[in-house]
């Protein structure tokens, strides 16, 4: 081969691995494929930052951008820094690009594919609607440009499309049927790399350093008591190994159990944000748990076991992928149509932790500060917002969780909100979490409340969950006057919960009637269509009736 031909071959020999989720080196089929073959003489590991995800939003109710609270932004940036460090140890690096045209991630990737003469593009498959539309643009460009594309499924244990195909073209609608169809997941890639191909010439492209969250203009966040959970693959593997070190705990793990008030040492693994960003491979995690199960005489089983939680995750991914309009009530054939209310006073009180119910408010403050709370705490505040007390649309709560949770996941977040509002999957709407007695079962002294609501730190434990019942003399001694230093309850739980049950019963009856209509189940192509509030019924709002002790 002459020198010109050799140079031409070298110029064409380039592969790109496009990171989106899957921010890891271990068990990463896209990275593994990109480093192999003739096109891997040079490897371009790319992540594209969308400015809209980071840009400060002064109108947002808490620090961060319109799309993400400061805790999740920080977790992402830490994950990118860690990925870059791990790639550098292998002789590579992360190429961080800024999206062109204010959010055109696909256009930015396509431009790099052309300018860097990429012959093979590898990226992890993503089933979210936004990602499907984005990836189609890139794949169409690649096809037209003669670029090979490899997009493996590795964010979940199973391929949702394959599960749906095995189920006759429909997603399985119960966990049990999903598990029966799924079987055992593929084995993870266990190879550990000693090096990766070098990065090729990037020309005149501006390669960004990973910014620090303090540099993004979110204002003074020093007092925000930011999350204890550091992002990145290194922390994910460390946390997983620490969780699995206690084999007896792993074998006996049962999801319904656990203390939602435990915050300094949470009662769960807190691996969900690492799975969400792909810092931890779900298949590798599953494989490690199974190794422990094989070494123990007895262990719990799905749905309550640790592996059962990973299967729940895949279940929601599969149902979400196979259900049009999964992220809204209208046009969603699996979601009950309920006349939820709109209330411009009650919703901000819930969102900002100002309901006057310390258990609810402490949870929402933990969410804002840490971006995480125990699953039973999530159940409490979701029930309170929707079918328990305020009867406000689950989509409103979903949006708050979507912005603030560091483990916010499109399929799981929407699925859980439909579940907890009794809109789908779970229908025992009469079972309501008490905003006063539920937390007390786990934390009678109210330590969780005292931590996140310091104004209540000196309230006697007899009144910590219902401070409005404390005599004025006790309130003065605790330096917390209800209605002045801490709000009065926005609703009377005893009254509001009865009204909610009544409205849920009426809505269920209406849905049964609608089942007989011939046009039942038609889909809407609109995205997150908002409900009209004109004919909706509002439970007791800020004009609260005289309060009784809640059950």
Swiss-Prot record:
GO terms for biological process: circadian regulation of gene expression; entrainment of circadian clock by photoperiod; pyrimidine dimer repair; response to UV. Its EC number is 4.1.99.13. GO terms for cellular component: cytoplasm; nucleus. Keywords: DNA damage, DNA repair, DNA-binding, FAD, Flavoprotein, Lyase, Nucleotide-binding. Residues 508-551 are annotated as: Disordered. DNA binds at residues 312, 419. It comes from the Eukaryota. This is (6-4)DNA photolyase. It comes from Oryza sativa subsp. japonica (Rice).
